Regions:
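Acidic/histidine-rich catalytic neighborhood of metal-dependent amide-processing enzymes
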Residues: 1-34
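Metal-dependent amide/peptide-bond hydrolase catalytic core
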Residues: 36-195
Length: 195
């Protein structure tokens, strides 16, 4: 919708984008970046498991570190207008595919996920931080330091964004909300990349 109107040449002083906000005024949003992680292993028959390297076990190390990394990132940023300061830029693994056969040590795991970008943080900086985290974590593992995971960025790459709460469009929306409900509007940030 929004992008189509811009491409067609429509302009405006402001825009109201309809997202499921429960009628909250949401002038600030986190960004969201889609990524793919490929974790290498070394395949061998399960009867000789000790001669192989399970990509699933190596992925488990990386996954646990991503959960800790998410917590660390939330301690570094101080962003107003969110329901919880610990839930501004979530990192989520949405799909995992690994192994070819039940009796083979898995040679690779491919995990795809979504990396949250804090308001005020550029997508470029967020990507670099994530890639650096994966690189540093890999250096602490005997296998991964020589066979590091591959990070790819694809599909949705949404920057964070915000509109000053004193901006006339925010003030107008808040006033309309008050006139309609008799209540003061709730200003709240959203944790997703909106168009």
């Amino acid at each position: 919708g929004t992008l189509t109107n811009i491409v067609k040449g429509f302009t405006a002083d402001g825009a109201v984008i309809l997202e499921p906000t429960s009628l909250k005024v949401c002038p600030i949003q986190s960004g969201a970046l889609t990524f793919r992680l490929t974790i290498p292993g070394r395949a061998t028959h399960a009867a000789m498991r000790w001669d192989g390297v399970s990509a699933i076990e190596k992925y488990s190390l990386i996954h646990q570190s991503i959960l800790e990394f998410e917590k660390e990132r939330h301690q570094l940023f101080n962003v107003q207008y969110y329901e919880s300061k610990r839930r501004v830029a979530p990192i989520n693994i949405g799909t995992i595919k690994g192994g070819e056969w039940h009796s083979t040590v898995p040679e690779s795991v491919v995990a795809e996920g979504r990396f949250g970008v804090f308001p005020g943080e550029s997508a470029k900086d967020a990507r670099e931080e994530f890639e650096n985290h994966i690189r540093q974590k890999s250096k602490s593992d005997e296998w991964l330091k020589d066979n590091p995971p591959i990070v790819e960025w694809f599909e949705g790459q949404f920057e964070s964004g915000q509109t000053d709460t004193r901006h006339p469009i925010i003030q107008s929306l808040s006033e309309c909300y008050f006139q309609s409900t008799g209540d003061k509007s709730i200003i709240e940030g959203v944790t997703y990349g909106s168009d």
